[in-house]
Amino acid sequence: MGGVGGCVNLRLKPNQHRHNYQKRTMTLQRILLLILTVFTLGAYAQKQPVDFVNPFIGTSNFGTTNPGPIAVRGMVSVSPFNVAGPKNLPLEKDSRWLSTPYVQENTFLTGFSHVNLSGVGCPELGVILAMPTAGDLEVDYLKYGTSYSDEVSKVGYYSNTLDDYNIKVEATATTRVGVSKYFFPKGDANILINLGLGLTNEQGASIRVVSPTEVEGVRSVGSFCYYKPEEAYPVYFVARFSRPADEFGVWKKPTTHKGAEAEWMGYNGKTRVMPGYAMEVVGDSIGSYMRYNFKEPTVVEMKVGISYVSIENARENLEKETSTRSFDQILEESKKNWNQYLSKIEVEGGAKEDKIKFYSALYHTLIHPSTLNDYNGDYPKMKTRETLRTQDTRYTVFSLWDTYRNLHQLMSLVYPRQQSNMVKSMLQIYDESGWLPKWELNATETTTMVGDPAGIVIADTYLKGIRDFDVEKAYAAMVKSADQIQDNPLRPGLMDYLEKGYLTTKTTNSGSVSTTQEYNISDYAIAQLARAL
């Protein structure tokens, strides 16, 4: 017999004695059972693509990925947040340009953020932070933050141990819900939701304790790359806990006043903790807490539903995606779904390290663009943010200057249905705003980077045979961006480009040569699509 899962050769002697028939039959049955067992073990012993993914790849050296669990193209990810506070210098978010909620070299953790970006170059999102602690209640993240150990990250799963509290944390996620398990020791325990802390440069939030098992609220985000502060927008959430809190409350740090008013205000500039407060609290530095007293080690599960439309939709997302499933069921389904997508490409040969690099890279291509619409199909309209509804998936995070060269070509070849929905999402953006996207984020146009890349993606998609979208509309949108001289957000300096054939340093300060090249490529894409129509 060969090794586990190997070929098994059997040679049975011919029947010589009838009285040994039953004995020989039972022996044959045992052998066949052993064969089936060996091949079953062999099948399980074979690694699947998810087993080769290392989510820590890209979390160092400004790779700006994070190791938190996320579903395929998920709206939600549960990332450890370790970029706040002087203990994380020099890689601290307020001390330098830093566009990620997690850096592998850092050691001081202040929570787990539920809305994050992966692989981008500008600080944004990194909000709705939850943090389990033990002992007395402390709401200052510089004081309740802690080092951590026993860090594990796999596809759909993250865990660590918070050293100061001896609390183990596990996390997984569905498309729109982050699910965490907190393993508390005996004694006093707290679960904090901090809406003042985040990676985003925007401020402003509201929070309300609905019951001893639920908190709801909204956090303002926006100003990606410090552009367009007028286009800040809300992220809504509902957090639900598996055990009712013994005590609950909120905190708020007000503005520091000076003069006579400060003399009368006993809490001037100080954080106010308000036990039992169940009204809505609005402010910049605010949060809520759930407090417990455990007579024995206890596990509390927390689910955080997210929506860009409303608190009601965040609650519905939570209920539809997680209410009937356990943590382990959600994790197993996430791994199964990831494996289905990663298995679209099978790799032979090479070393184990090569497969780790390949499948980790493929994994990262399936994070963004990500899902914008809620479970019921609702999503916010560009500019006005009124509620619209889609029957397909409405995608967001179109970092097209970064992705038009190769990511979308890969999507067309390997995941054509996703790519089709991405093109349809771009055309929805055109319908809503009047322009194709340039660098769209959660129904806002950041206009970051140069060029006019959406048309390149659309033309390439069509020429690769994916044609279940309104190509006439797409072509008209592409021509508009190439022809409209005035008030054109996609092609600044277009008049000079059309007259001279290139941009000058007097026309743009964003790189005249590179921008000219981008316009050239876009025009070529329009020409190729026109030829095919």
Predicted regions mapped to residue ranges:
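Glycine-biased, low-complexity coil/linker segments
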Residues: 1-3, 31, 35
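Short hydrophobic targeting helices and cationic amphipathic motifs
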Residues: 10, 16-22
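Ala/Thr-enriched low-complexity intrinsically disordered regions
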Residues: 14, 25-27, 37
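Bacterial N-terminal signal peptides that target proteins for export
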Residues: 21-32
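Hydrophobic h-region of N-terminal signal peptides that target proteins for export
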Residues: 36-44
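Accessory carbohydrate-recognition regions in carbohydrate-active enzymes
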Residues: 46-456, 462-517, 521-533
